[in-house]
Amino acid sequence: MINMRKAIFILSLTTILFSCNVEKSSNASSSDEAKNFIQSQFDFFTNSSLEEAQNTFSSDAVLIGTDAAEYLSGWDEIKPSIVGQLAIEDPKFMTRDLNIFMSEKGDMASYTQVLDFTFNIGGEAGEVKNVRNSGAIKKIDGQWKVVQIHWSIGVQGQAVEYEY
């Protein structure tokens, strides 16, 4: 009888321990998926594909660009900007310093990263370094989508001066 109680206790304890580990594995899997999506989110540029771009953004995504006029809400506003940007030839993104913050449910993440961007446009080579990129992605109907993306380029000086 004591051996049976011991066996039931050990079996129960093992079940509890393994069931607690499921969420961590699921969250680790979601984190890997999110990281892969973030790292591939600019593939539509490389492939010059408007269709891929539309599949990358949610229909109600917000894009905040480096130009003062670039505060775009929803795919209908984002699309013309993307069409213009797809004229860029041979785009290459070199990213670094990626930080990802996952939601507890593993269905949403925010991220920050820095990137360098090289390209050709009209036969002229171009390069932009140290672009700060952040955003939020969400799993919608089983697919990761950009729901918000923000681009900025640091300039010397502060818009509002303060000590730090």
Regions found by a protein language model. Give the residues of each.
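A short gly/proline-enriched turn/hairpin at secondary-structure junctions
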Residues: 62-73, 86-90, 104
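Positively charged n-region of N-terminal signal peptides that target proteins for export
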Residues: 1-7
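Short, low-complexity N-terminal intrinsically disordered segments enriched in polar/charged residues
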Residues: 20-51, 55-56, 160-164
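Hydrophobic pocket/interface hotspot
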Residues: 41, 53-54, 61, 74, ...
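A mature extracytoplasmic/lumenal domain signature
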Residues: 67, 104, 113-117, 135, ...
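Surface-exposed, charged secondary-structure patches
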Residues: 79-123
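Short beta-strand edge/turn micro-motifs at domain boundaries
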Residues: 130-158
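Sec-dependent N-terminal signal peptides
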Residues: 7-17
